[in-house]
Amino acid sequence: MEMTNAQRLILSNQYKMMTMLDPTNAERYRRLQTIIERGYGLQMRELDREFGELTEETCRTIIDIMEMYHALHVSWTNLKDTQAIDERRVTFLGFDAATEARYLGYVRFMVNIEGRYTHFDAGTHGFNAQTPMWEKYQRMLNVWHACPRQYHLSANEINQIINA
């Protein structure tokens, strides 16, 4: 992340204020303030992750994934025989915190801040699937989009989607 000295000074002052406003996270803010003030390039890359960007297309894809899981769960609930498919298979897991942190952050934002998909169970890991999921979700979306009745899926269609 490239910043002018003026930008670094402003950000440093922001971190200084945050240490006073949020004492529980003061150490974290002091550390970030030091990194910014001294211009430690390697550690400043952490800010790239914090201030990263998701394109509109990526955000829409994540919402589409969440909507697919909503449709899967609704369809599963409407099945006469729900025993044939384990409910965990139609439960949204989230994304991997280690490799898909930006996607995970967006999911948490959508649920916790925007109040969408609040019926999703965050589990004990807060939607951290602990394994990369993006490619799997892409395959699932392709199958789901090909279904004629996306919110009234049969057991066979549900199985095709979750096994994609």
Swiss-Prot record:
Domain of life from the UniProt record: Bacteria
Secretion signal, residue range per the UniProt entry: none
Family membership: Belongs to the UPF0304 family.
NCBIfam families, A to Z: PRK05445.1
HAMAP family: UPF0304 (MF_00762)
Name of the protein this chain belongs to: UPF0304 protein YfbU
GN (gene name): yfbU
